[in-house]
Structure formats: C-alpha cells, structure tokens
Amino acid sequence: MKDLLMPIQENIRNFSIIAHIDHGKSTLADRILEYTNLVSDREKRDQYLDKMELERERGITIKAQTVRIPYITADGKTYILNLIDTPGHVDFNYEVSRSLSACEGSLLVIDTTQGVEAQTLANVYLALEHNHEVIPILNKIDLPSADIEKVKAEIEETIGLDCSTAISISAKTGLGVDSVLEAIVQQLPAPKGDPNNPLKALIFDSWYDAYQGVVVLFRIMDGTIKKNDIIKLFSTEKSYEITRLGVFSPEAIDIPQLSAGEVGFLCGNIKTLGDAKVGDTITLLHNPCTKAIPGFKEIQPVVFCGLYPSESSDYDILKAALEKLQLNDAAFSWEPETSQALGFGFRCGFLGLLHMEIIQERLEREFQVELIATAPSVIYKVETTDGKIQEIDNPSKLPELGKIVHLYEPYVHIDIHVPSEFVGNVLKLCEEKRGIQKNIAYPAQQRVIITYELPFSEIVFDFFDRLKSATKGYASMDYEVIDYRISNLVRLDILLNGEPVDALAVIVHRDKAYHYGRSLAIKLKKTIPRQMFEVAIQAAIGQKVIARESISALRKNVTAKCYGGDITRKRKLLEKQKEGKKRMKRMGNVELPQEAFLAALQMGDD
C-alpha cells in the first residue's frame, strides 16, 4: 500500500492509448483494469473509463480520463501505471496534445482488419512530437479477416515505427494483455523531474462537479504538492487552497501528497472551468516556478451555428441547459441572438463538426429541448472600405456588398485515407469542393493517402457524409486549419414575399451561388405549406435576384353560393376575393416550418 501512496519515481509509467474509433482503445483499457484486479466482476461494464452515456453509445472518448494502476511484474516488483485516456477525434486535438504532454509513452492500437486510419496517424505524429516512446499493438487478431503482416508493413511504411516487437492481442478476449503490461514497464521510460524543485504541474483536463466545484486533473513535472497547499494558476494569476487531493484508481482515493512524475486530481473551490484551463501550469503561491510549461493556448471555436428552441416558451430551459453544458466544456461558447424568422435563440461556437453534433445531441437527450439548428458557418474575415478587418461568424452580420474590399475564408489541410478503388470518387468530390490537390501517396498496396487544401466552409457542410457515401464508409479523414485566403464570396439571401429570412442567409462562392440559390428555392417550395395568397421565394445577392419560385395560393370557391343568375354578381365576388388576397399578401406572415431549415441543412444531397 505504501508503494501505491508514495511510489518510487523510477517505478512510475505514464502512458496513453492512441487508436482510431472502434479499433479497441476503450476495450483494451477495460481489460487492463480487469487484469490488474482494479475492477471486480460485479462492477464490470464496457468502456469503464467513458463516463458519459453518449461516449459509451457512440463508442468514442470525448473527455480525457485517468486511472492509476498498481501492477506487480513477473519478478515481483511493484509499478504504478498511470493510464491517461485521450479522445481520438480531430475536433479534440488540443485536449489530445495536452494529455500526451502528461505522458512519456503511448500504446498505438491498430485494428488488424482495418489498418492505419487518418486520425490514428494524426495522433501518432502528435505523440512523436512529444518525444513519446510508442509501442505498436495489433488488435483483433482473433478475427478471421485479421492480416497481421500486412498491417505491420503498413505501420512501418506510413509511420516509420519498427514493428518487429509489435504485440499481437485480442482486447475482446484478453489475449496478450499480460504482454502489453510487461512492455509498458520494460519499454517506456520513467518520468523525469525533481520532487525538491518548485512545483510545476500541467492541467490536462478539468470538469465541473456540483459539490466540489471544478475538479482538475494534472501531471506533476517538478516539485511536490500537498493537501491544504495554496496553489497559483499561471494564465489567470488566481490562487486557491487545495481542499482535496487524490488519484483515480479507478474511483477517487484521497492522498496526502503527490510528487514529480505522478498524476492526480485536486479540488480547491474553483468556481468555473475558465479558471482552470486545459494546458495551464499549476505552481505554489509562496514558492512559484519561474516559467510556465510551454504549449498552452486558449481554445477558439471554429464552427458556429444558431440554436433555437422549436417552442419559444422553452427559451429559458435552453439557456439553463447551455449554462450547464458550458460548466463541463470550456471549448463551447454561446451568446444570445434573435432572428426575425426563429425568434430568440443562441449563437453557439464549437471546435468542429463532431463537437457540434455531440452538443446538439446532449441538449436534446439530457435536457429534452427540441432544437432548430441553422446551417453551420465558419469565421470569415472581411476587409471593409474604411480599412478595418472584421471577423464574421454569422452570414447575416456581413456588411453590404459596396462596403467590402476583400473577403477572406479559412482553408484547411486535409489528409484522406481511402482504399485505392475509391480514389476517383474522392478526387471528384474534392475538386467539386474547390480543393487544391497537394499529394497522393500509396503507403500500402490497396491504400491511398490523398492530401488536399480545401476551404473550411466546404467541409463543415456535408463533406464528411458525402465522403463516406463516395467510399462506402471506408474513408477516414483528418484536417487542420492552416490560413486565410482571399475568395470570391457573396452572401446569398432568401426572400419570402420580398422579406429576407435572416436564418436562411449563407455565404457561398460566387460560382456556386446560382446553383445553391436555385436548389434551395425549389426545396423551400416543396416544404412551405400553401397560403391563402401567393408566396414568392427569391434567392438574391444584394439587390440582384438570381432565382425565383412561386407557391400558388389556395383557392376558395367564393361563387359556390351563386346559383346561375347574373355574371356581374360572380365577378363582384371574385374581385372582392382578389382585393382580400392582395391585402393578405401585404399583411400576411409566411410561417416557416422546421422542414424549411432542414432543407437548407441538407442542400448537399442534390
């Protein structure tokens, strides 16, 4: 027990597991916990470390989790293994890079039936940038379609890792887990750092707990930390007294002190996540370290969309839900906004598309709020005639055409991994999305890595869905924003009876504006119910209408009660109806159904 509370530094191993979705990362973590008797049969459940219901259901890891594992080797020595479970998705890249900074090594888990995928590659490169020792692990060898030699060759070719010592396992059955634990102890380095130096610790995750305030996960690089110490955070300069200090093994265990190389958690009446940012440095107030740990950056949202309650009476429920979600997700931002078409709602910012999907799903699932979401948008930069540069995250905020000198849009560097038979489909899709081809590589016989530079706005819309359907679900992709470039962009407005609908405005490339406007007008014609008066649907750039559709009026037979008789009587009734319709058209409001907004979101299906 003493070894668990006060381990010898050279007997500590901090490691993370890198894997693509469904390659077996959480399953391997489960088996390690079972093999080391940390989780009893009674407590067993799949994906033990994935606390969120949504994480278990989608089979992905969204937040980093950690567990301290005491392990006795074959020769009787006790080691402490700290597993830091990282998210694998590109949207959470910064969280991954901070989690990797807290470790010295990684297990690279690859599904032998699938091979190397794009997100695996992205995270391996991150690990190698952090000077990690990487152990390749070949998973799912119990499946008949496993091709171990081919995958080994692919890893050596694409990543450059020596696979002669790669460990073959089946995380599902537990085969080979003992070899993995021995390899962690033998091949990964012990953490460096001096317990007698001033405290320097890295925050790699934090979340909000209703009873204790913010819980901070950290890794100590130098120094020692004790309960009741007063700590200071570098980026905010705020100080807190530690009220609770401990480790997860896998449930929380209180510990009086932790020192260099160890991973743990602390609570200290920290009120908001913004005060304990991922990547920040913790030190002691009275004996601080001089330099922060490098690599800290403020996370900025890159994708925006409007979220509105479908019932306006749910506005306060949605607001409370957003406040609650923000407590546990510092990367998610929101501010109130109003739309003439949708009423009161919120403009929300996300790290990427998966992040946006997860937030929307959690709002609907955990808080039972029905949402209307507007089309996602990225941040554009506008240079206006007065020489200023503005950032625009909402198409309706774009200045008038006459005031714009240049419009800049973000570009991304994208790597797409795809079986060779689908290369033609992927190239066609990327060209259609205004892509610039950079490279095509063939790391293995049947696999291709296609590299493109694409406008980010083309990706946020429907790129991923179309990529999956063009490749029968076999493609995987990884992207990062690289720079802003001048583009010939315009704002396309949709007008109903001459009135612009702000929630349907989009920024598109001028070459695509006509096709987009025409398609959307046709879709709206199908989804907006007929009214008692004619409805004109127009797509316009500034004052110029580029497409128009009309929904004809419902006709009530006002002459039904005239039996034969005078034609002037009928004409009088018809004229009266015509006048009434004119007045209605002038006064009438066209109710936009939810389907109209869905039509705008599904524009890529044409």
From Swiss-Prot:
Topology in membrane: Peripheral membrane protein
Top EC class, one word: hydrolase
UniProt entry tagged with the keyword Nucleus: no
Classification via InterPro entries: EF-4, EFG_II, EFG_III/V, EFG_V-like, EFTu-like_2, G_TR_CS, LepA_C_sf, LepA_CTD
Entry's Gene Ontology BP terms: positive regulation of translation
Stored Pfam families: EFG_C, EFG_III, GTP_EFTU, GTP_EFTU_D2, LepA_C
Protein name per UniProt: Elongation factor 4
Upper classification of the organism: Bacteria, Pseudomonadati, Thermodesulfobacteriota, Desulfovibrionia, Desulfovibrionales
